[in-house]
Each structure stands twice: as structure tokens, then as C-alpha cells.
Amino acid sequence: MQQVLENLTELPSSTGAEEIDLIFLKGIMENPIVKSLAKAHERLEDSKLEAVSDNNLELVNEILEDITPLISVDENVAELVGILKEPHFQSLLEAHDIVASKCYDSPPSSPEMNIPSLNNQLPVDAIRILGIHKKAGEPLGVTFRVENNDLVIARILHGGMIDRQGLLHVGDIIKEVNGHEVGNNPKELQELLKNISGSVTLKILPSYRDTITPQQSYVNMERHPAHVRQVFVKCHFDYNPFNDNLIPCKEAGLKFSKGEILQIVNREDPNWWQASHVKEGGSAGLIPSQFLEEKRKAFVRRDWDNSGPFCGTISNKKKKKMMYLTTRNAEFDRHEIQIYEEVAKMPPFQRKTLVLIGAQGVGRRSLKNRFIVLNPARFGTTVPFTSRKPREDEKDGQAYKFVSRSEMEADIKAGKYLEHGEYEGNLYGTKIDSILEVVQTGRTCILDVNPQALKVLRTSEFMPYVVFIAAPELETLRAMHKAVVDAGITTKLLTDSDLKKTVDESARIQRAYNHYFDLIIVNDNLDKAFEKLQTAIEKLRMEPQWVPISWVY
């Protein structure tokens, strides 16, 4: 493995391997778990045992034939013959030869046992008494439900006290706690167990069900088998279990914020997954499943509905229906529901593109130009195409690439443009191939495009780092505009109405496309905004990154 790692840097030129594949391979081979498995494999290979012979009993009998005549001559021979003829020693040799030759007879069939069906009522002597030790306020990591007037364990949270001890299982019935019957109220039992400290004695009626360990029930996120790999998701909404009226146990919930990375450890319940924080660690907690949260967010109240909230019903709800039209692409995006996004952890690497998103006039172009001027060896950008005629002082390929309108229309129809538009009767646009040309030179291509283009860019082909340049408050924006006008940097005067449009447009873009953004920078000072962006880009080269799973598999 070490030799492979040392030669990885030479592979791209010699084999034509994709850079992202090599980064992923390096990340796997440098993983401590993989290294430990490799060491264990080597040790097992080195110490592999093989039987010297599988006919030792036959060999001993031949020895006995040779030395038996010498019994009367030598006492040691007599003692050895006695040992070799010992029934236990003969049986040991016979067992060794059977194992060495791997010749096993089927065991005799045992008489059929009358085992009662597990579905029948369990006998009284099946009741078990368990003892645990806990601190006051420490959660056990279980939730309960009422079943046939009994309190039954509904789920065991991954990494919790009960999960670590392995004494209880889903379906077990709780009969008593410290000698007192528990009744049939799950909330009362949760409070009782939460407040108890010291030794706790539980009387349970086991379920005798086949239990599945949390490691066997990782999420199957559609394309990949659940048990093969760990599953991580990026959250696109804030969640506080104490504000959720649907969660079966608020104390068992896991609070998280938008943008956090969670590890999903169990998805057996269609409505409530078990997850844990990747950054903070700790035991797992309940979070709403993709299905449940989509269901909650997909329904809107009718305009005429004033009947108040209903629990567990959607009779007074309606779905908003909309046909997808390319002319209403932005409107369709506004209603896109984003809950969780599956991600994978990658070693540090340079992104292929840096995409700056924001409202018109927030400073995206100024930031882009500053990066390219200060470090042209690392950053580049595209040259836009246009159908207008070049002016006298313009050269093809500098500010614009000039093509005929018919050629440009044909390429637009063929999907060769990332974005395009028309101004004063002329077409303008950014070609997809021009982005790849910059990337192929080893530089990061900086783009300031419309947010709708993110659907095309957010793939493994472009690997974008998406930064939203947010507009500051109206007062700050007004002061910034006055400063650039007074300094003679611009002669274009903007009214308060223009500035307010910028602020409103910035807020609209953030609401609709927030789930695409890797970083948000409020541009209330161009120098500070540049420093923040520069720091973030440098971190990409030094720290591991969480990227969409589709970039890896």
C-alpha cells in the first residue's frame, strides 16, 4: 500500500487516470481503518497454519509394531508404548487426522424437539430481570410505544447506553422498574427513567425477535447497498425536536442546523431516522426522515381554510401544481424541496470552478477580476461569445469571441451554452467548452453566472465551489455606492429604487438557491469580502471536503 501511495503522483501522466479517482483512492488508502485491516491481513497471512500430516494414527500404529518387541529390554520403551496405546491419545490423533483431512461426517440427527411457536404466548419463566447503572438525567437511548396495553420498546438509539450494553431489544415489554409496575404511559416511563440515578432494576418480557444491529441497518440511499458503506448527509433545513409535535420522544431527538453533516445510522422507521453529528460525535438521535419532512413541506394551507390545525390529517391541505416550463425555470426552482443531500468526505483538492452567485451590482465581477489579476497562474475565466459585429478597437478572443448569429443559434439549440441572452438585438453567452478549456490548463475557472446555471455546473465534471455574494442592508449599500461615485470609480448613478431592487433580488436568490451554496459572504466591504473568499479557497487545499456523493460514485 505504501508503494502505491508513493507512486500515485505519477499515475495521471502515465495511465490517463482521472484526478478525482486518484484523490478518492488516496483517501481510502490513507484511512486508518483500511490501514489496520491491511496490517491484520498481513499478520493472518504470515501465521497461516497447515497440518504437517493427516495420517498420524496410522504412523503411530507402525511405530508400535516396531518398538513393541523392545518392551522387555528397555523400561522407557514400555512407558512410551503405554502412552501411545492410551485411548485418549489415540482419540486425539484420530480427531487431528479428521480435521487435517477436512473429512467430516454429518452429525447424527437428533430427535425432533417440540419447540413452541414464538408467536404463542411466552411462558411465565421467560421473564428476565436486568440491572443497569445510570446517572440522573442520562438518557437510556430508547423510545416506547403502547401495544396491547403494555409498554414495548419501539426503538433503540444507536450509540446510546442500552445499545452499548446490548441487554434490551426492540419489542421487549417493560413490566416493572425497581419493583414498581410501569402502567401504559410512555411519557411517564421516560420521565421516570430519566430522573432515576444509581442502580436500576428492570423486569422485562423478552420479544425473542431477531435483532438487527445498527451497523446492519445503515441507510440505503437508493443506489448503493446500505451495509456496504457509511452514509452521510448534508442538512438543508434547521431542526429542533422540542418544536416538533410529531416526534415520538422530544428528548430522543437530534437538533441540527442547516449545512451540518450527519451520519445516518438507522432508517428502519419510515418516518424517523437515527443519526449522529459527524463533527461533535456522541450517540444517535431521532430526525425526521426524507419522506416525512417532504410531506410536511409539500403541502400548503388553502386560502379559505380557517378551521385551525389538525394532527395527522391532510384533509384540509392542497398541493400547489405547476407545469414545468423553461420560461418559468426560476419559478419552478423556488418551489423545489431540499431536505437532505447525501455527501462523501474527500481529501483536500483544488476545485475546478469557483462560481460567484449574487444579485446584479453586489460586486461579483470586482472580486473575480481581483483574483485573476493577483494570481493568473491559478485562476482564469471564460471569454463570452457574441453575435454582434466587432468594433474597430476590438480583437477577437480578448473581450469577446465573435461568431455569426446563425452559428450561435445553432449551438444554443444543441445545448453548447451554459447561459445566453439577448441585448439590443445581439446574442451573448458563455460556452460550456470554454469553461473546460480553462480547467484543462490546471487553473480554477471563476464564473459569475445566473443561479439557474448551477443545475448544469454542480456535477463532477465542473466540481464547483459555489459562493453567494449577498447584498448588505440598504443603508450600507447606499453608502458604498456613494463612496465609489465620489472616488470617480463609476459615473453610473443608482436611485434608492435601484438599490432596493438589488437587496430584494439578493434575498430572493438566497431563499431559492441556498441549498447550492458552499459559502455566503455579505459584501459590506469589498476588501474584507475578498479576504474571506481567499481564506475559504485556501482551506480547500488544506482541509478535507464534503462533496455530493455523485461526484465520487
Swiss-Prot record:
Keywords, in A-Z order: Membrane, Phosphoprotein, Repeat, SH3 domain
Location of this chain's protein in the cell: Membrane
Keyword Nuclease: no
Occurrences of domain SH3 (ranges): 228-297
Stored SMART domains: GuKc (SM00072), L27 (SM00569), PDZ (SM00228), SH3 (SM00326)
Residue span, L27 domain: 1-48, 49-107
PDZ domain ranges (all copies): 129-208
Main localisation: membrane
Domain of life: Eukaryota
Limits of the Guanylate kinase-like domain: 351-538
Recorded topology in the membrane: Peripheral membrane protein
Listed Pfam families: Guanylate_kin, L27, PDZ, SH3_2
Residue stretches in coiled coil: none
Modified residues (Phosphotyrosine): Y513
Entry's Gene Ontology molecular function annotations: guanylate kinase activity
InterPro entries: GK/Ca_channel_bsu, Guanylate_kin-like_dom, Guanylate_kinase_CS, L27_C, L27_dom, L27_dom_sf, MAGUK, MPP6_SH3
Membrane spanning residue stretches: none
One GO cellular component term noted in the UniProt record for this chain: membrane
Keyword Cell membrane found: no
Similarity field: Belongs to the MAGUK family.
Quaternary data: Interacts with CADM1. Interacts with the LIN7 proteins.
Name of the featured protein: Protein PALS2
Organism listed in the record: Mus musculus
